[in-house]
From Swiss-Prot:
The keyword GTP-binding does not apply. A lipid is attached at C4, C19, C20 (S-palmitoyl cysteine). Belongs to the band 7/mec-2 family. Flotillin subfamily. Pfam families: Band_7 (PF01145), Flot (PF15975). The gene is flot2a. One of its GO terms (biological process) is cell adhesion. Heterooligomer; Heterooligomerizes with ic complex of flotillins 1 and 2. May play a role in axon growth and regeneration. May be involved in epidermal cell adhesion and epidermal structure and function. This is Flotillin-2a. Gene3D superfamilies: Band 7 domain (3.30.479.30). It comes from the Eukaryota. Its main location: membrane. It comes from Danio rerio.
Length: 428
């Protein structure tokens, strides 16, 4: 059987041998691979960046000046399968330190060879170009090892014989000399130029003064013209302002008048509305109640009038009905009386003296009542007589006078009625 092996992205897994034969190799970067026991070999190689510090001491340049150069290089194993195979052939099984040592020696060799072809000034003054040249020369050799140079820079350049400092001093002296000469020439040129400038300045000043005077005169003339024009414009502006102000004032007054007219109209409208409101209020509070009261009184009067009319009509109808009833009653009574009289007349005619006697007897109580009416107010009657027989005589006398009175009243002669004859004449 076998095992499964894994590596991170900073390492490459190299699998060799196995079922694929003795020449079969596989490279796995940041992954996994299967390996058979006993017949498969598993190894790892780092892909991390390696920092190298190549240093070449006392290397003679093209001018024979011994200098020391130090640099910094960043290198790593390339991941292309072919180049990774080259790296595995060269460094598989070696430590990182051993790999760094091989690459460092290669870079230092190329650095020495390049230093011999350049001057100190070229190396010192153009370090970037020098580093680029080293990188271009060393890249093919380390590339055949499967190594890539990511960067190469010159860290320091110095020497033990003070060549660089002397070079700097000579250059400094030359620069100082050139500076002094330049200062002297500048001062000379400055003096000459100053004199020329003074002359030019005087000429220019004279011309300037002349021009200034002319300019001043023209300025004064222009000022006068400007002042005149300004005053004219001011007067015109003032006049225009006053006219405009008068117009604006007139507009304002017109606006005020219009506002007053509008206010008056509104006031009149308000007063008219107030009058209408007052009228409505008076109508509602006085006229309507008065009209209602008048209508009420009118209705009451009309009702009373109607009541009186109806009452009068009812009374008249009542009187009419009563009159009609009384007339009917009287008519009926009259008819009854007439019928009674007719019947009585017939009876009288039929019965003769007997009927007359009945009439007399019927009328006697009434006559007696009428005669005795004055006596109704008399409590008692006392007859004074010394002789007891005299009273009887008085009664007889009254009875004897009664027929005469009845005859005078009714026309009936009671003396001819047998019954009364017996009553008035007891001796017979």
């Amino acid at each position: 059987m076998g095992n499964c092996y894994t590596v991170g992205p900073n390492e490459a897994l190299v699998v060799s041998g196995g079922c694929c034969g003795s020449d079969g190799k596989t490279y796995t970067v940041g992954g996994w691979a299967w390996a058979w026991w006993l017949i498969t070999d598993i190894q790892k190689i780092t892909l991390e960046i390696m920092t190298l510090q190549p240093k070449c001491e006392d290397v003679e340049t093209a001018e024979g000046v011994a200098i020391t150069v130090t640099g910094v290089a960043q290198v790593k194993v390339m991941t292309d399968n072919e180049l990774l195979g080259y790296a595995c052939e060269q460094f598989l099984g070696k430590t990182v330190t051993e790999i760094k040592s091989v690459i460092l020696q290669t870079l230092e060799g190329h650095l020495r060879s390049i230093l011999g072809t350049l001057t100190v000034e070229q190396i010192y003054q153009d370090r970037d170009q020098f580093a680029k040249l080293v990188r271009e020369v060393a890249a093919p050799d380390v590339g055949r090892m499967g190594i890539e140079i990511l960067s190469f820079t010159i860290k320091d350049v110095y020497d033990k014989v003070d060549y660089l400092s002397s070079l700097g001093k000579s250059q400094t002296a030359a620069v100082q000399r050139d500076a002094d000469i330049g200062v002297a020439e500048a001062e000379r040129d400055a003096g000459i130029r100053e004199a020329e400038c003074k002359k030019e300045m005087m000429d220019i000043k004279f011309q300037a003064d002349t021009k200034m005077a002319d300019s001043k005169r023209e300025l004064e003339m222009q000022k006068a013209a400007f002042n005149q024009e300004v005053n004219t414009k001011k007067a015109e502006a003032q006049l225009a302002y006053e006219l405009q102000a008068a117009k604006e004032q007139q507009k304002i007054r017109l606006e005020e008048i219009e506002i007053e007219v509008v206010q008056r109209k509104k006031q009149i409208s308000i007063e008219e509305k107030e009058i209408l409101r007052t009228d409505k209020e008076l109508i509602a509070t006085v006229r309507r109640p008065a009209e209602a009261e008048a209508f009420k009184m009118e209705q009451l009067a009309e009702a009373k009038k109607i009541k009186k009319v109806l009452t009068a009509q009812a009374e008249a109808e009542k009187i009419k009905r009563i009159g009609e009833a009384e007339a009917g009653s009287i008519e009926a009574v009259g008819k009854a009386e007439a019928e009674k009289m007719r019947l009585k007349a017939e009876a009288y005619q039929q019965y003769g003296e007997a009927a007359k006697t009945a009439l007399v007897l019927e009328a006697l109580p009434k006559i007696a009542g009428k005669v005795a009416a004055p006596l109704g107010r008399t409590n008692e009657i006392v007859i004074l007589s010394g002789d007891g027989g005299r009273v009887t005589g008085e009664v007889n006398r009254l009875l004897a006078e009664l027929p005469v009175s009845v005859n005078a009243l009714t026309g009936v002669d009671l003396s001819k009625i047998p019954l009364l004859q017996k009553m008035t004449n007891p001796q017979a």
